[in-house]
Curated annotation (Swiss-Prot):
<protein>
    <recommendedName>
        <fullName>Ferredoxin--NADP reductase</fullName>
        <ecNumber>1.18.1.2</ecNumber>
    </recommendedName>
</protein>
<dbReference type="InterPro" id="IPR035442">
    <property type="entry name" value="FNR_plant_Cyanobacteria"/>
</dbReference>
<feature type="binding site">
    <location>
        <begin position="224"/>
        <end position="228"/>
    </location>
    <ligand>
        <name>NADP(+)</name>
    </ligand>
</feature>
<dbReference type="GO" id="GO:0004324">
    <property type="term" value="F:ferredoxin-NADP+ reductase activity"/>
</dbReference>
<feature type="binding site">
    <location>
        <begin position="253"/>
        <end position="254"/>
    </location>
    <ligand>
        <name>NADP(+)</name>
    </ligand>
</feature>
<keyword id="KW-0042">Antenna complex</keyword>
<dbReference type="InterPro" id="IPR039261">
    <property type="entry name" value="FNR_nucleotide-bd"/>
</dbReference>
<dbReference type="InterPro" id="IPR015701">
    <property type="entry name" value="FNR"/>
</dbReference>
<feature type="binding site">
    <location>
        <position position="75"/>
    </location>
    <ligand>
        <name>NADP(+)</name>
    </ligand>
</feature>
<dbReference type="InterPro" id="IPR001433">
    <property type="entry name" value="OxRdtase_FAD/NAD-bd"/>
</dbReference>
<comment type="similarity">
    <text>Belongs to the ferredoxin--NADP reductase type 1 family.</text>
</comment>
<keyword id="KW-0793">Thylakoid</keyword>
<dbReference type="Pfam" id="PF00175">
    <property type="entry name" value="NAD_binding_1"/>
</dbReference>
<keyword id="KW-0605">Phycobilisome</keyword>
<feature type="binding site">
    <location>
        <begin position="111"/>
        <end position="113"/>
    </location>
    <ligand>
        <name>FAD</name>
    </ligand>
</feature>
<dbReference type="GO" id="GO:0031676">
    <property type="term" value="C:plasma membrane-derived thylakoid membrane"/>
</dbReference>
<keyword id="KW-0521">NADP</keyword>
Length: 294
């Protein structure tokens, strides 16, 4: 049975007002930046969602033109049942956006991410959505799920991994392989590290974790170890898996990450005289190559 995909239950004109239950720092000492794990109470409304979807957050106040702020979309980091597995919450993984102003050189902080990162437990939050059909998990319990994330791109994959391994459901018992490639700058930036390591210990046959820690590890050329270097390193095995009809590949994170991944896959496919860009187009047509970058 195809799961009904909920979309836009709450629209920007009439958002759902949830409550912040908790807001915890995910980056440990020695890491860079701030990334928060937020849990919102949604028990009072009709908000439903699936793993791989996003919700919109409308920051309070007005922009420089006196207009209400536009919503920002964030990938959901929890399964449809929420972190407490009681169907009453939704979680986000939010990095505080900061950048240097091109003209003044001042540090500018993102409006919505700063609002969320500083949100206190008990505070109201305006939520819209859910949206997204691109990043949904297949129903097939024997599927191979390849996930490639940088930074907070881990959010949907945390939802996937909880769904696959943590929650045992009568109607969904995963027997396939889930392989996560995760790119971060420093070890303390490994978001959800403890959860990931527990899964590795508990499900060594079904879960693989490959980290690319750019400021601590070196690639074979002596440069920084980025996610695309790990893809290249494992390209032959990935190519073998990707040819299976029930393999799904998901990419989530910063816009620039796709180029390097394509390079690695291109080299592997090339060994078998396959043109990767043609092959990838076919995968996209069959809804087996899923990309969400921002």
């Amino acid at each position: 049975a195809k799961t009904d995909i909920p979309v836009n239950i709450y629209k920007p004109k009439n958002p759902y007002i949830g409550k912040c239950l908790s807001n915890e720092e995910l980056v440990r000492e020695g890491g860079t930046g701030t990334v928060r794990h937020l849990i919102f109470d949604i028990s009072g409304g009709d908000l439903r969602y699936l793993e791989g979807q996003s919700i919109g957050i409308i920051p309070p106040g007005t922009d420089n033109n006196g207009k209400p702020h536009k919503l920002r979309l964030y990938s959901i980091a929890s399964t449809r049942h929420g972190d407490h597995v009681d169907d009453k919450t939704v979680s986000l993984c939010v990095r505080q956006l900061e950048y240097k102003h091109p003209e003044t050189g001042e540090t500018v902080y993102g409006v919505c991410s700063t609002y969320l990162c500083n949100l206190e437990a008990g505070a109201d939050v305006a939520i819209t959505g859910p949206v997204g059909k691109e990043m949904l998990l297949p129903e097939d319990e024997d599927a191979t799920i390849i996930m490639m994330a940088t930074g907070t791109g881990i959010a949907p994959f945390r939802a996937f991994l909880w769904r696959i391994f943590k929650e045992q459901h009568e109607d969904y018992k995963f027997k396939g392989l889930a392989w996560l490639f995760f790119g971060i700058p420093y070890s303390p930036n490994i978001l959800y590290q403890q959860e990931l390591e527990e899964l590795q210990e508990e499900f060594p046959e079904n879960f693989r974790l490959t980290l690319a820690i750019s400021r601590e590890q070196q690639n074979p050329e002596g440069g920084k170890m980025y996610i695309q270097d790990r893809i290249k390193e494992n390209a032959d095995q990935l190519w073998e898996l990707i040819q299976k009809p029930n393999t799904h590949t998901y990419i989530c994170g910063l816009k620039g990450m796709e180029g390097g991944i394509d390079e690695g896959m291109s080299a592997a496919a090339g060994k078998f005289d396959v043109d990767w860009s043609d092959y990838q187009k076919e995968l996209k047509k069959k809804h087996r190559w899923h990309v969400e970058t921002y």
